[in-house]
Amino acid sequence: MGARASVLTGGKLDRWEKIYLRPGGKKKYMMKHLVWASRELERFACNPSLMETTEGCKQLLQQLEPALKTGSEGLRSLFNTIVVLWCVHQGIPVKDTKEALDQLQEAQQKGKQEVAAATADGTSTVSRNFPIVANAQGQMVHQPISPRTLNAWVKVVEEKAFSPEVIPMFMALSEGATPQDLNTMLNTVGGHQAAMQMLKEVINEEAAEWDRLHPVHAGPVPPGQMREPRGSDIAGTTSTIQEQVGWMTSNPPIPVGDIYKRWIILGLNKIVKMYCPVSILDIKQGPKESFRDYVDRFYKTLRAEQATQEVKNWMTDTLLVQNANPDCKSILRALGPGATLEGDEPAFQGVGGPSHKARVLAEAMSQAQHSNDAKRQFKGPKRIVKCFNCGKEGHIARNCKAPRRKGCWKCGQEGHQMRNCTNERQANFFRETLAFQQGKAREFPSEETRTNSSTNRELRVQGGGTCPEGGSEERGDREQAVSSANFPQISLWQRPVVTVRIEGQLKEALLDTGADDTVLEEIELGGRWKPKMIGGIGGFIKVRQYDNVTIDICGKRAVGTVLVGPTPVNIIGRNILTQIGCTLNFPISPIETVPVSLKPGMDGPRVKQWPLTEEKIRALTEICTEMEKEGKISRVGPENPYNTPIFAIKKKDSTKWRKLVDFRELNKRTQDFWEVQLGIPHPAGLKQKKSVTVLDVGDAYFSCPLDENFRKYTAFTIPSVNNETPGIRYQYNVLPQGWKGSPAIFQSSMTKILEPFRKQNPEIIIYQYMDDLYVGSDLKIELHREKVEELRAHLLKWGFTTPDKKHQKEPPFLWMGYELHPDKWTVQPIQLPEKESWTVNDIQKLIGKLNWACQIYPGIRVKQLCKLIRGTKALTEVVTFTTEAELELAENREILKEPVHGAYYDPSKELIAEIQKQGQGQWTYQIFQEQYKNLKTGKYARMRSAHTNDVKQLTEVVQKVALESIVIWGKVPRFRLPIQKETWEAWWTDYWQATWIPEWEYVNTPPLVKLWYQLEQDPIPGAETFYVDGAANRETKLGKAGYVTDKGRQKIISLTETTNQKAELQAIQLALQDSEVEVNIVTDSQYALGIIQGQPDTSESEIVNQIIEELIKKEKVYLSWVPAHKGIGGNEQIDKLVSSGIRKVLFLDGIDKAQEEHEKYHNNWRAMASDFNLPPIVAKEIVANCDKCQLKGEAIHGQVDCSPGIWQLDCTHLEGKIILVAVHVASGYMEAEVIPAETGQETAYFILKLAGRWPVKVIHTDNGSNFTSSTVKAACWWAGIQQEFGIPYNPQSQGVVESMNKELKKIIGQIRDQAEHLKTAVQMAVFIHNFKRKGGIGGYSAGERIIDILATDIQTTKLQQQISNIQKFRVYYRDSRDPIWKGPAKLLWKGEGAVVLQDQEEIKVVPRRKAKIIRDYGKQMAGDDCVASRQDENQNME
């Protein structure tokens, strides 16, 4: 038996004996089970010695498992025993046999997956997510990306918002993807425009770098050989999926997918850095921050760092220790380099917490060593000292770390000290009467006498009952849900010390909600223990850890870990308190107020109260008196200078009055709020529930307190009739109706209040929008209503009432404008009014009702009704209905006659969306899960551009429906679209980057969407070629349009009231009209080309509609563009024909000079057009022919804060060197310099040089260490410069200088070969940017613009001073022949012969001789010797 029992030894045997035979059972595995198993194995002809190793157990399990299906219960027991034994050998922690079986099953599945993966790797080298597989003919073909993968990617981006986790998720989801797959993934998240723009820029830069490093080989590509991919091919914009597959599967392969993915990851890293701008160097542990929280922050930031894994490993090894607080740093160093965060985390327990200021481990160890040395050196008899305070040996009361006990240390009575004590009795400081006498909760003062202050805290143990001595059993769930008044309560005016029973032993212990663990002084507990060191009040102490110890506290039993050691006081920690439901309570817990402030630099409203009728004053006085009694408002005195006007209106269908406050002025001055809820919940998103209740919160806003510091700004006044008495002034104590902050603060407060109820009742669904609550569950109706009453009681505890009047218990439920039934929903009944005459206001209301109805009534249209009220019309203006609008309204009335209902959402079924074309640019859609049971319907009639087609509009409808579905149901439906695959593919080929739509299928629902015509990609051989052109004179509006053909035909027509763009289109229409069914057309108008290449089938332009009609008649049309004035035969000929008498003569002798200057400076087209008097098209063509200027398009210039004194500074890197760039925000003027190091000293020197050249008021920088240094701050202080720091990812923040960094690098790249050193190239690039590039505001160069801005600023300031001086004077004047002097009037301007003045609202010019100018002395009366006409008129007014 000894040999068989030796299967497990040491710690493994201890773990074996802790595992239960059954879940929830009492029996555990013992030694005898091992002996029995070995005998049974011999009976089954198996080797028992295999039980001694993990591998042996695995072999036994493989042998026994096939026989389980037909085996006996004994065989199953043997198998279970071997499974548990295998877990013990493996070191897998399990509590019982069932957990062991689960662990085995997991291990087996994992093994199968690894085998399958190894097999797949051995047979195929292509991706498993996006496989490129061989078809039946042996060709490699691509399987497209699945909607599930796309949905997962969209969900990641929406939930993680470009946090560091996005990058590994993208890498996983895009494993083996082609560039086309990657572009599809990017298009699905195209709504994040700013992030996608950054990504696009990185991809463009990488593509340009690829082209530079992989130049195209001269000559044609040999037959049978694939061309080499360019940067744009890798990005998927100029390559087909067949080419991408070919490159990826060629020999040797070119992994274009992996290359493109690497570029995207570079861009994602940049985006992540913007979203997570904190540097790893800034992550430092706070003095009171726990080590775990610090490590979490450290690794989260580390994931966002753009560095190699080696660098990140170095950061972990050095920075993690370096930036820890002193306590944790010393512990980390003491633990040594071999320590692991998981294994040594207990060493940091209590370190850095707010209630435990621990000493460092090294110090504790050294103290222990010193004490041992001292003991060895101690000689003579040992004197035992005993503490009077805690009664323990080893220290005296003066050095006692336990809290001081009240009263005499000898007898325990108060009123005297121990030295004056006459009693012989020893005090019992741990007597049971301290907190609970004979097991009962001590009595407390009544609610009336108890203070309402936040210091009146109580510990409450959930569940009634007596203390352990009473021996009461646990009660049922229903008995536990008693009112809080029956819970044992322990006041925190004194220390909460109670008697607890630990494994049958009584102990006094302190209930400590701030302690993690339960720590007791010396107590004998049976069983095994393990050593541990913890941080306590007096430093580190060594303790013994006992697991699964039973503790009884106040009739509640808990089983947990107990630490035993030399603690100054017994502590029951959170590991036990949470099990018994002990909570820290505040008897009266007011809703926490949200701090509110005014906008910076603004003061409260000071609007006078307007007069009110006696009836309204009486009503307001009555309302305010009642509100004052309820505490909603309180009176204020004259010290409050603010006021907001109030008035009263009668309620609908009632004689009662309603108080209204005009908070418009306060709303302008109050800070902005973020709406917590961005939309209203929709019934189509509700899951069908067996039991439903709808509640309404009464006086919602008046239940939430307003920030005390903000209340003074809500003051208002009730006046008295005829000013009989001073007005009564009040201010709000709660959220006022009509104030802009009330909705957001109420929603936030309501969410916090409902959160605990939601956690305690996960089976209850609560939809909350403002004061409307929808409560649904699958409980029986009686139990559901009990839960609703609990919710109402919970809300009432926080001061929110739910009136019975609006408590809906039976269907149909009226909620949010909808009508809810148990199995369906609809909108509340809609009645369309019948009117003889309709005003603009009536039609607006009518359209609103129809728009509301269209979410469930399919087919509703409002386009013709909307046309009736286009333009700026008065609300009361009568509108005449058109025939189309009358017909549309009649159709809508018919639709609304039959009631329509919507279904509820079933998560187990698929979402389907079907779209129909209604004609006239209107579309309808239905979203359903079962046919004819719509969840929701809707319409779409928006034209995003003047010229569009049905395919483009269809994609817009799909995107609207997809977005709506994600909002309501959290996923994208499968679409059924009225368009054939061939039609879609024909349009998608050219416009795949324009938009994204998910998986869809064709449904034959007339009218089908089709492309009415298609333009050819190459010239049509044999077809006549028309060179077309049009021209117009801007002044006379006269023009010509015409064509010439390659066969000698020509035609010119004259036009009136036209423009250049119209004339160009007219010429194309003329060519289409006079040509055969196949035609080639050549134009020099980019405008016309852009419209027609979009293949529109409808347009707001009459001429474009005519062109569309002509295009539909043609079989083949090829349309091409050539630049004007370039000597192209037919183009030049027609240009001369249409220009005669129309266009002004153009002198183009400056082209050569412009080309020469561009080769030197690479200036932009605007600068050349301005400097050399060239047409824009010619200047653009010069830029287009320059290979160095075709890397990227020009940046789109926006506008930020354009104050003249604001500069943005940033450091950028090029060729391994640092360039410090400063940009004048208003003008775009740039100063840049190569600096030797990115230090505060160099930055401060640069700022002082900049301030010496230009007036710098504000500099805006990022949070780099050089900009935040004290040297830079000192330089800014000396130069009087205000320094601001950027907000990450804010376009108003660092956008200008970031854009200029790219522009500077672009210019440097164009002229780099002209300079030997980078610092020279930088200064040359700055010169080119400032003086050789024109555009933007005013068409100036940046250098001209900054001078113009500064000069204008000086002139404006001077003019304001002059105006200010002039306004100090008043004018008396005589008008025509009237001898009476008039005045005083305001002086506006003083000239040599006349003055301009303003008398009341009239402005007059008066001759100088008829005017007398005097200084304005205010209301001071002039004396007898002060005559206005004697004032000196020649005072300096400049």
UniProtKB/Swiss-Prot annotation:
Amino-acid positions noted as binding Mg(2+) 3 in the UniProt annotation, renumbered to this chain: 1210, 1262
SMART domains: ZnF_C2HC
Catalyzed chemical reaction(s): Specific for a P1 residue that is hydrophobic, and P1' variable, but often Pro; Endohydrolysis of RNA in RNA/DNA hybrids. Three different cleavage modes: 1. sequence-specific internal cleavage of RNA. Human immunodeficiency virus type 1 and Moloney murine leukemia virus enzymes prefer to cleave the RNA strand one nucleotide away from the RNA-DNA junction. 2. RNA 5'-end directed cleavage 13-19 nucleotides from the RNA end. 3. DNA 3'-end directed cleavage 15-20 nucleotides away from the primer terminus; 3'-end directed exonucleolytic cleavage of viral RNA-DNA hybrid; DNA(n) + a 2'-deoxyribonucleoside 5'-triphosphate = DNA(n+1) + diphosphate
Listed cofactors: Mg(2+)
TM segment ranges: none
N-myristoyl glycine: lipidated positions: 2
An annotated GO BP: symbiont entry into host cell
Motif (Tryptophan repeat motif): 984-1000
InterPro entries (UniProt xref): Aspartic_peptidase_AS (IPR001969), DNA/RNA_pol_sf (IPR043502), Gag_p24_C (IPR045345), Integrase-like_N (IPR017856), Integrase_C_dom_sf_retrovir (IPR036862), Integrase_C_retrovir (IPR001037), Integrase_cat-core (IPR001584), Integrase_Zn-bd_dom_N (IPR003308)
Domain notes: The p66 RT is structured in five subdomains: finger, palm, thumb, connection and RNase H. Within the palm subdomain, the 'primer grip' region is thought to be involved in the positioning of the primer terminus for accommodating the incoming nucleotide. The RNase H domain stabilizes the association of RT with primer-template. The tryptophan repeat motif is involved in RT p66/p51 dimerization.
Name of the featured protein: Gag-Pol polyprotein
